[in-house]
């Protein structure tokens, strides 16, 4: 019979770093509210949550790496919004942010969850930041909690 390893949604005693891009701040702040709600609902103490605001999404991966390298965080949650415009800038930023965040997690071994919206329109971003399509900040925080707990089962 195989052993199934699953993470409990219990943030009690865990320390989280959250990074929020200020560009498209209306969206970023809704994502942050969702992430904080998920963490506190699942037992996190607000005093164990650090929030770093950075200029935009492009700065998120390096900030996540610096946070992870401190060894102070059980998980890092990355939040922001990259919304398509009329130039190829969106494609470059969206690709680099997603690759960069994944690289930080693989390089450091610290769970880094991706709650950076990459949408075609502002309406899609609003939907994913707490209206019709739920709150992806909440989802990213839940992912962070569960991943930490799965990793703890490997010990």
UniProtKB/Swiss-Prot annotation:
Q: What is its EC number?
A: 2.5.1.78
The lineage is: Bacteria, Pseudomonadati, Thermodesulfobacteriota, Desulfuromonadia, Geobacterales
| SUPFAM superfamilies in UniProt | Lumazine synthase
List keywords of the entry alphabetically: Riboflavin biosynthesis, Transferase
Identify the InterPro entries for this entry.
LS (IPR034964), LS/RS (IPR002180), LS/RS_sf (IPR036467)
Q: Name one Pfam family in it.
A: DMRL_synthase
Binding residues annotated for (2S)-2-hydroxy-3-oxobutyl phosphate, in chain numbering: 86-87, 128
Q: Which pathway is this protein assigned to? A: Cofactor biosynthesis; riboflavin biosynthesis; riboflavin from 2-hydroxy-3-oxobutyl phosphate and 5-amino-6-(D-ribitylamino)uracil: step 1/2
- What biological process terms from GO does the record include? riboflavin biosynthetic process
Q: Where is the active site?
A: 89 (proton donor)
| Domain of life from the UniProt record | Bacteria
Give the matching PANTHER family: 6,7-DIMETHYL-8-RIBITYLLUMAZINE SYNTHASE (PTHR21058:SF0), 6,7-DIMETHYL-8-RIBITYLLUMAZINE SYNTHASE DMRL SYNTHASE LUMAZINE SYNTHASE (PTHR21058)
- Organism of origin: Geobacter metallireducens (strain ATCC 53774 / DSM 7210 / GS-15)
User: What GO cellular-component annotations does this UniProt entry give?
Assistant: cytosol; riboflavin synthase complex
According to its UniProt entry, the function of this protein is described as:
Catalyzes the formation of 6,7-dimethyl-8-ribityllumazine by condensation of 5-amino-6-(D-ribitylamino)uracil with 3,4-dihydroxy-2-butanone 4-phosphate. This is the penultimate step in the biosynthesis of riboflavin.
Please write the reaction equations for the catalytic activity of this protein: (2S)-2-hydroxy-3-oxobutyl phosphate + 5-amino-6-(D-ribitylamino)uracil = 6,7-dimethyl-8-(1-D-ribityl)lumazine + phosphate + 2 H2O + H(+)
Q: Which positions are annotated as binding 5-amino-6-(D-ribitylamino)uracil?
A: 23, 57-59, 81-83, 114
**Paired cysteines (S-S):** none
What terms describe the molecular function in GO for this protein? 6,7-dimethyl-8-ribityllumazine synthase activity
Q: What is this protein called?
A: 6,7-dimethyl-8-ribityllumazine synthase
For this chain, the family text in UniProt reads: Belongs to the DMRL synthase family.
């Amino acid at each position: 019979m195989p052993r199934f390893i699953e993470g409990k949604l219990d943030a009690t005693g865990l320390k989280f770093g959250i990074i929020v891009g200020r560009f498209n701040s209306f969206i970023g702040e809704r994502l942050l509210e969702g992430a904080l709600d998920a963490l506190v609902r699942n037992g996190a103490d607000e005093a164990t949550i650090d929030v770093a605001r950075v200029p935009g999404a492009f700065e998120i991966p390096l900030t996540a790496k610096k946070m992870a390298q401190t060894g102070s965080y059980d998980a890092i949650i990355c939040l922001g919004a990259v919304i398509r415009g009329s130039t190829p800038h969106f494609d470059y930023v969206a690709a680099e942010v997603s690759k960069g965040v994944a690289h930080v997690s693989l390089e450091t071994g610290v769970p880094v969850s991706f709650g950076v919206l990459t949408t075609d329109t502002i309406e899609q971003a609003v939907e994913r930041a707490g209206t019709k399509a739920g709150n992806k900040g909440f989802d990213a925080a839940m992912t962070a909690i569960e991943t930490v707990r799965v990793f703890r089962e490997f010990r």
